[in-house]
Amino acid sequence: LLTSKQRAKLRGMANTMNAIIRIGKEGITERVLKQIDEALTARELIKITLEKNCDKNPKEAMAYICEKLNAEPVQVIGRKIVIYRMSEENPRIQI
């Protein structure tokens, strides 16, 4: 689990990031989870946008994704989600 200071640092880093994954009307499918998993492996910290036609609540979506992919929730702002998972082989972000 992340401490509040670690989460604050990650929020600051995510502030300038663009969302690299968009979740639309199909919702969170296995294909989307695979994309998120690959992005987390490559980048550790990612931002996801839930489109307006997505039926999931952003907080529920973040909890579901984090549970499925063993990631840490960082932040929800509107329809944007920020999640973090430390790379086991090559950690890039020092928190």
Where are these regions (language model features)?
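Positively charged, polar, low-complexity stretches
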Residues: 1-95
